[in-house]
Amino acid sequence: MQTAATSTFFANPHVKHLPGPFLRPSPHYGALVHLPSFRNKTPISIAMAASPSPPPLQELTITRPDDWHLHLREGDVLAAVLPHSAMHFGRAIVMPNLKPPVTTTARALEYREEILRALPPGSNFVPLMTLYLTDNTSPEEIKLAKKSGVVFAVKLYPSGATTNSQDGVTDIFGKCLPVLEEMARQEMPLLVHGEVTDQHVDTFDREKVFIEKILAPLVQRLPQLKIVMEHITTMDAVNFVESCKEGHVAATVTPQHLLLNRNALFQGGLQPHNYCLPVLKRETHRQAIVSAVTSGSKQYFLGTDSAPHDKRRKECSCGCAGIYSAPVALSLYAKVFEQAGALDKLEAFTSFNGPDFYGLPRNTSKIVLRKSAWKVPDTYSYSSGEIVPMFTGNTLEWLPSDQLEE
């Protein structure tokens, strides 16, 4: 694993008086090199100019990415946010935590049709549906899901862990074990929100404790079950994923957990638009995740966890968890890999590792990322209100093209 990027993001993107959103590395001014003198055999010092670095890349063409963790909601919110994902992503794993949740294959088929009806004309975007695992899910439902050809995974929400998770699992090794065994037989991946919900566990330790108490025993008990640890936030998660067999355990990574640490929640006042679950962690964890995803490992792939909420539900006394990143995600991932000197590994993370893990073909179309500054809108309006995007009002450097190259 390579070391973390030296140029990192610490400033809060929602505080306008702070420096620009990305800190730059210090310039390299050259070095003094000692060489021997052939006459007197004593060393002499000469100033050596730094080797000129190649000009920064201005354009990058990659296979069209997929989003392996996306919240699309329903109704007018779905209609407003879907074009942002469909513009740049070929497919997306669509989360099932609606009200009520998508617990059956029949409901997944209905939701899929709602998404397809909301697509912009001419869009080739493909929603990959998921089921919401409950204590009452049956092995027969897993068989139906596999047979449908449109349900690609089952999502585990520990009850009370995040938005609309109140119907989630309370007894994974008891009530859910027959379902998980059937999933292993059907090669149906389990997508895990990896946090315990015990009230005595510190919020910042919920992922670590989940790995120790739930995930590690689950992998040991069902080694053939394919598991995706969603939106990882800690070096503990990195270490666990890399201790597991490639092709059986993987992880999605969000832009916010690559670019922000927990300071971003509090700089310049409480920042509700940086609040998500799992919550942002300390800087050492962020660096570990950057190192992992930019190392070239096949066990990590793009999952934005883009989670739109109305502005009024974020800026209130009890705000919702979730960051709306779909419009800016590719720009931010490109920046992370550029800062790490790993743009050559961006395509595998965005476009190859995900479909390879799921056993799906890679996309054949291309998309272009250009170095062209653009300003993130303050809000996106929809019929019932406004949604504030990640890095609202900031200027980003990489601009994904709207036109695909075949």
UniProtKB/Swiss-Prot annotation:
Top EC class, one word: hydrolase
GO biological process terms held by the UniProt record: 'de novo' pyrimidine nucleobase biosynthetic process; 'de novo' UMP biosynthetic process; pyrimidine nucleotide biosynthetic process
Pfam family, one: Amidohydro_1
CDD domains documented for this protein: DHOase
SUPFAM superfamilies: Metallo-dependent hydrolases
Positions of Zn(2+) 2 binding: K155, H193, H231
InterPro entries recorded: Amidohydro-rel, DHOdimr, Dihydroorotase_CS, Metal_Hydrolase
Subcellular location: Mitochondrion
Gene Ontology cellular component annotations, sorted alphabetically: cytoplasm; mitochondrion
Keywords in alphabetical order: Hydrolase, Metal-binding, Mitochondrion, Pyrimidine biosynthesis, Transit peptide, Zinc
Cofactor note: Binds 2 Zn(2+) ions per subunit.
Residues bearing the modification N6-carboxylysine: K155
Sequence similarity: Belongs to the metallo-dependent hydrolases superfamily. DHOase family. Class II DHOase subfamily.
Protein name: Dihydroorotase, mitochondrial
Provenance organism: Oryza sativa subsp. japonica (Rice)
Lineage: Eukaryota, Viridiplantae, Streptophyta, Embryophyta, Tracheophyta
